[in-house]
């Protein structure tokens, strides 16, 4: 047999040459940029060193422009640092320095940095070089980065980066997966024509043992509810109503007291200027800092992200079980091979791998508690952590993508569901016992134990038990009918339908609110 035919390919398909992107991915030092690049590629536009430098350069220039405006209000004893505000043309030209930041600029930065051994100094040298003669060079050299420490820029850049990760990468992914959970709850509830039940019911398990029947829709609604409760943390409620999560920004010098700026230009309310500048960047100004802000809010955000991973980990556990029990099955193409040696298998390898990526992410995000432990008034242990943020968030993105891949090709296995239900009529025993106890039958629990001990429980056996109770006058015909009815499993699900309706409605409402708050286009 032609080996390519097994994969649905031909010789013509093999006539290919690698693209530069292919070569980059095949030689990547980590799976993020290699095997899993399809899941993490959007992060490159947010967390790469190139983007970090561009964002830092942008903040330096916006600070410079704002400083030019602010000095028009300064009436203190010293000459103004910038005598007149920048013109509209100068502002546009200055902003183009960071808006047009290119790969060539990045390489130039890398040429400068080893000489200075300081990334912020190197960036400012490049900024001055690229500004050229936009405005007076002496003014630029005097005013750029004036009164600032590196952390005044880097702390804000990190907060902006994290907010962009959440808004453009994480939130669209997690809300998309939540929509899938909600959609599968509805889709899997429906049954094919001719099916003996009006909706899909499975045998619920507790402690890995068969317990009571439950609609598959309610199973999925519970997953959606757990995730919904975690996602609620991303809605910040205050006096101004609901808001997206906003991180802190800081500007206060080396130890948070703004010593350098206030020494140079005393008697001026620089804090109000910083607040307006930071808020214009989309952050909330935090004046109470040392070299960095406390990072408590970013840790709160990371805790929320970690919590949202736990419902996904539960789903990963359950998904494998539902497949192995035959409750769910995956649609596969004819050329798909689930195992290299066992032809009967189609392994849930994407979901199983997703669980590992989430465990990595939760462990990595836990390390970020170090952000709150800087030595004395400041050190650079935080710097490495901040550069690393794409790794845990990339792991989460990979996991969400893999969960979605498997979920999208999964359907109920109706034959397997019915086989399991027929093999385990004991899932009606709890309701049977309660009906008998309510009817006043003494020792109802022990009666059922004795009737079924050591035997394979069948609906016919239970009907015999009921008929014996009716014939012996221990229960009336109506009670006997109620007992028999619970062996029709869709009639023995309590208020599951109503609860699922409520839960799924609440979960979808949260999705829509988060989409509005974070500016995410609705997928429906």
Give names to the regions the model predicted:
Residues 187-190, 233-236, 240, 279, ...:
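Conserved helix-loop functional segments at active or binding sites
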Residues 186-217, 329-345, 375-383, 408-423, ...:
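Glycine-rich cofactor-pocket loops
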Residues 267-295:
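Active-site-adjacent "gating/activation" loops or surface patches in catalytic cores
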Residues 56, 116, 170-177, 216-223, ...:
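Amphipathic alpha-helix face/heptad-repeat signature
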Residues 290-396:
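A conserved active-site cap/scaffold subdomain adjacent to cofactor or substrate pockets
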Residues 63-70, 126, 130, 165, ...:
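Generic, well-ordered alpha-helical scaffold segments in large soluble proteins
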Residues 2-239, 244-258, 265-274, 338, ...:
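A helix-coil-helix interface module used to build multimeric assemblies
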Residues 353, 357-443, 447:
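Long, amphipathic alpha-helical stalk/connector segments used for oligomerization, subunit docking
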């Amino acid at each position: 047999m032609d080996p390519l035919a097994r994969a649905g390919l031909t010789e013509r398909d093999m006539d290919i040459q690698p693209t530069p992107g292919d070569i980059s991915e095949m030689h990547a030092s980590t799976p993020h940029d290699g095997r899993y690049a399809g899941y993490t590629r959007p992060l490159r536009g947010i967390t790469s060193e190139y983007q970090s430098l561009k964002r830092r350069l942008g903040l330096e220039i916006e600070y410079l422009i704002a400083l030019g405006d602010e000095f028009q209000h300064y009436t203190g004893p010293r000459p103004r640092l910038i005598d007149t505000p920048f013109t509209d043309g100068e502002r546009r030209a200055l902003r183009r320095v960071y808006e047009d930041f290119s790969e060539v600029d990045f390489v130039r930065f890398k040429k400068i940095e080893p000489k200075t051994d300081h990334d912020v100094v190197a960036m400012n040298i490049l900024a001055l070089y690229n500004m050229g003669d936009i405005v007076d060079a002496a003014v630029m050299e005097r005013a750029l980065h004036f009164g600032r420490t590196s952390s005044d820029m880097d702390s804000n850049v990190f907060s902006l980066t994290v907010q962009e990760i959440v808004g453009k990468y994480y939130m669209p992914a997690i809300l998309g997966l939540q929509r899938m959970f909600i959609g599968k709850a509805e889709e899997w509830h429906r049954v094919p024509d001719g099916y003996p039940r009006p909706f899909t019911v499975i045998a619920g398990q507790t402690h890995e043992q068969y317990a009571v029947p439950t609609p598959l829709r309610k199973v999925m609604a519970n997953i959606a509810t757990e995730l919904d409760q975690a996602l609620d943390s991303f809605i910040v409620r205050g006096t101004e109503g609901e808001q997206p999560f906003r991180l802190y920004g800081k500007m206060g010098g080396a130890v948070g007291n703004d010593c350098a700026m206030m020494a140079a230009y005393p008697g001026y309310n620089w804090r109000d200027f910083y607040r307006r500048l930071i808020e214009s960047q989309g952050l909330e100004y935090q004046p109470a800092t040392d070299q960095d802000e406390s990072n408590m809010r970013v840790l709160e955000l990371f805790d929320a992200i970690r919590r949202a991973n736990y419902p996904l980990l539960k789903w990963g556990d359950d998904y494998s079980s539902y497949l192995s029990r035959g409750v769910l099955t995956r649609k596969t193409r004819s050329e798909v091979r689930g195992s290299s040696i066992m032809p009967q298998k189609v392994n849930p390898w994407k979901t199983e791998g997703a669980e590992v990526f989430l465990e990595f992410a939760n462990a990595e995000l836990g390390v970020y508690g170090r952000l709150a432990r800087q030595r004395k008034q400041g050190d650079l242990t935080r710097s490495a952590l901040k550069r690393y943020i794409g790794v845990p968030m990339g792991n989460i993105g990979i996991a969400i993508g893999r969960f979605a891949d498997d979920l999208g090709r999964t359907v109920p296995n109706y034959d397997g569901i019915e086989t399991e239900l027929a093999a385990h009529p004991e899932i009606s025993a709890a309701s049977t016992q309660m009906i008998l106890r309510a009817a006043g039958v003494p020792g109802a629990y022990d009666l059922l134990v004795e009737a079924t001990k050591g035997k394979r429980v069948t609906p016919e056996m239970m009907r015999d038990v009921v008929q014996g109770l009716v014939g012996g006058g221990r229960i009336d015909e109506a009670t006997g009918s109620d007992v028999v009815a619970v062996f029709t499993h869709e009639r023995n699900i309590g208020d599951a339908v109503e609860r699922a309706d409520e839960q799924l409605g609440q979960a979808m409402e949260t999705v829509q609110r988060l989409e509005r708050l974070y500016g995410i286009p609705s997928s429906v």
